[in-house]
Amino acid sequence: MMLNKLTEIVMKKYLFFLILFLNFVSSYAQVKDTLKLIFIGDIMQHGPQITSAWNGESYDYSDNFQYLLPLFNYADFVIGNLETTFNGPPYTGYPAFSAPDDFAKALKDASIDILVTANNHSFDKGVSGVVRTIKVLDSLYINHTGTFKNYEDFQKNHPLIIQKGSIRLALLNYTYGTNVGISKSSVLINIIDTNEIRDDILLAKSYNPDGIIIFFHWGEEYHRLPNTSQIEIANFCIRNGANYLIGSHPHVIQPMHKNILDSSNNVESVVYYSLGNFISNQRGINTDGGAIAYLEFTKNQNKLHINRAGYLLSWTWKKFVNNKYIYINVPSWEFNKIDSNSADQNAMKTFLDSSRNLLNKYNVGINEYYFDKNQNKLFPIDTKSYEYK
């Protein structure tokens, strides 16, 4: 009798520890997958930028992104709007852009992984410009969507699938139109049309993604608030199943919203109406910098959540060195790289102040971050104690 009682106690303890062990193994097996995405705005090549890059032998853009490389390496994917073509020489800036191939290589070297190519400058150099741009990107293994050299290319890259581990997202890209008329050819470009977008969202869903991203080229240039059309298109897309909307074209930053859309299914959505200029020669107030969107996803038990939705600010420094200008994208946390109290530093301060005043007033659920390269982490800007936030 005593032996049976002892055996029963031992078995209960064994079962207790076995259950604990199995729970541990189960929770370990369900380690959350994460995905970190960065989005950047208008990547431009005005004439002075092209002239600046020439070193007598080639076009050197190595200065452009030096301060952002640690942040971009931190992300799993960096996605930007390519607002130039690679049509070969002669190289031209505004109004019909064609940049050196070296600039494409500089984007690749800066850890920019994906470029959306549907914008009003896509056809600046006609059909040949579209085709050659895609060939240059393909040669550098830079993924792309928005314009397509033929139907086969369209089928391959529309939607563009972004995947890390078990997390899978579908990316679509559209523009309101092009500056140069689109001639009939095998080349394709995605134009904003709600009927087409609805169909494309259904197509994207057939790939069983965890979420759908749409990168739009829309809105009014130099307007700091979204217009009615942007808001209506955003609401339409979200109602039809898109989750994360990114905007470009206005060349200035516009507000950002994170929403819980529908209490019945608790869908999360984010809209960044415009990220402004990532790099350009535009020097007017609010056009000399931009926002960097940051989305961090966690997937647990087959459900994707936005762990963090934020933004970071950066400014294009047109620095005079050795009798010429060079262009450097300076993020807010590298403010002190610019000479103290100089006209350049004051210009960056003006940009940061103006951007924060706008976004602090109109943003919903999306706050500013900075990147600490020593800790390789993002932190809320309010925790940063540098000379100028």
List each language-model region with its residue ranges:
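Sec-dependent N-terminal signal peptides
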Residues: 14-23
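Sec/Tat signal peptide C-region and signal peptidase I cleavage site
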Residues: 25-29
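Positively charged n-region of N-terminal signal peptides that target proteins for export
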Residues: 2-14
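Acidic, metal/ion-coordinating pockets
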Residues: 30-389
